[in-house]
């Protein structure tokens, strides 16, 4: 099957281009692996750098090496060849940037299933909070501002890459997968696998994640900024804290928004680590926390109350916190026993929670042509 698809790359490029529009028209042809007689950068934007641990035609063997080589201005694209990359990645350049994970033509057009089974690129590390390390310093992948800058990347995109923090097989402390702060960043068809604090949208961060899966146990969607998760799978590896743990800011819509998604017991969990009705949708990091679930399937692991207080002496959810649901489904989507402070939205009320509404306009840094 692989050879047949490779043959198509040689003789039917026009037909192939029509196929790749099912993913992202701008980049999918670039992402497909090519026959050895063709450049791996066929179909890529001009100036694209190629990273590979095995292909001698690569410009670099490390993702971070490629990033450090980039000029400070202009749009930059990096294609990452198939492989497992043990490194931390830190992006501080301000101009637009794209990271592309290579795809096998034989599986690239299969439904992702939000498990990223078609992804060929993994970036991992294993740091966790110890010996004075901060949360942010444990992140496998960071997009933030550089020294002296007011803001970082204005338009970062990543496609079909699996990011993982392998600090432990069970939460031992905070161990981030991502840190997106002072930047606009979007992710397509990716996986983020961790335990505690997997996903972090930090101060002045704006993030969009689609067609992806996020694994975690404790507060694994947390932060200060604005994060929209569209058509994702949230996979509970265990039940600790809540899925979301946000710190809101007065007068803003900073929060976590989960739409058209699924919450499930992680495939690597068991009945001991994820028991029925024990996982909470969130807990408030401060009393202005925002978390909204729209049209989301929730399995039997979700607690009937939905949300819980922070704990550690904060034993109530204040009415300044905004927790809300609309059209939840599945065994855990029964809203009859939700905490009284939660907002159970009507169809009219739910209409205010859109990408454009949350980000105060249509974000130019989101690839709306990406199709699931």
Regions found by a protein language model. Give the residues of each.
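Fungal secretory targeting signals
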Residues: 1-25
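Sequence-level preference for short, compositionally simple segments enriched
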Residues: 23-372
